[in-house]
Amino acid sequence: MGFIGSNVAVRLAAAGARVTVVDCADPGCGANLRNLAEAPEIRIIRADIRDASAVEGALRGVDVVLNIAGEISHTHSMRNPARDADLNATAQLYFLEMCGRVAPGVRVVYAGTRQIYGVPQYLPVDESHPVRPVDFNGIHKHAAVAYHQLWSDSGKIDARVLCLTNVYGPRMALNVPGQGFLGSFLRLALLGETIQVFGDGR
């Protein structure tokens, strides 16, 4: 029910897909039930992706899983690395094991982050760029990418990984701390407040 997931879910439902959303509804991660209000046909299951009883039922009969579960805050990961590891790495292990067992061979599209590459050594950053995360969020997200690749290589699932960066658009949370600088900048601009830019802004 967060920013990216809700946009994809609403578009898929409008295209005629049968959509089920599994979300723990953590407001600190951007969850907002109103994001899905325009698509009442979407089935919503409020559960953590580690909740086998909820997730296994949701996985039965699906063609594609869009896996956007996790914590995206880099600052939160540095304050509480164990929590970030639990949400972004350990939870993915549980979830992928369920996918392989309940829906063998299912296509899983994982929304990773460009943050796994760290400070760019060249632009544009591509898949050949060295992996050098600069925070725990990047480390744990990289572990999740490796889990998806391993499960896919073993034939249990058919995984695809996207490395997203600075995504913005409709339904973006502007008032959730730690959700990226774009939302913060937009909120400050709307409030007519000063936006502080460090360095030359590049």
Region annotations inferred by a language model:
Residues Y122-L123, A146-R202:
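NAD(P)-dependent short-chain dehydrogenase/reductase
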Residues M1-V167:
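N-terminal Rossmann-like NAD(P)+-binding domain of SDR-like oxidoreductases, especially those catalyzing
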